[in-house]
Amino acid sequence: MRSMNRGTDWTAISEDLTSGGKQGNVAYGTLTSIDESKFQFGLLYTGSDDGKVFVSQNSGSDWQNISATLPKDLWVSRVVASMHEKQRVYVTLNGYRWDDFTPYVYMSDNYGASWTNISNNLPLAAVNVIREDPANPSILYLGTDNGAYTSFDNGASWNPFYEGLPNVAVHDLTIQARDKHLLLGTHGRSIYKADISLLQGII
């Protein structure tokens, strides 16, 4: 759904972008993540709880399934349009529902036509969120059930980011660009803030 008047009116801009609901007490057929590119109005990405990822490049008039080569039937924990490259998009998937703790992290540089696995040296832990650094395009931040990680080479390798952080799942990340702060939302252990100004200077 889309509203152009702050929520007063809503218009459907898609058909069902999932595989459809299933019987039982565990929700299926639900969109879990949506993002719009800052480079183009109407360049939209969605992810669902049954592993479907779709892209629309015309404000929802047409949608393309871009998840055919991704692992099947996993929870799309985050889909993120790049703030540095128009065609780049990231997807993280979570397999906890199947007792699968593999870290699933993918990047595409062609609107999702093909994907590169960038989980590399991450330990076994479900991945909940990925963010780009707003100042340094080589830096990525990741929140997992095993804590936070950062990459200085676009996901080729990952480093633990744990100083001052308890051993806890990180469910969300956001960056306050002006003050150069990374904010981490954890599972029951409050919100943490980290100064990332020194990290942003690493090339």
Locate the predicted segments by residue.
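Beta-propeller blade termini and top-face loops
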Residues: 1-203
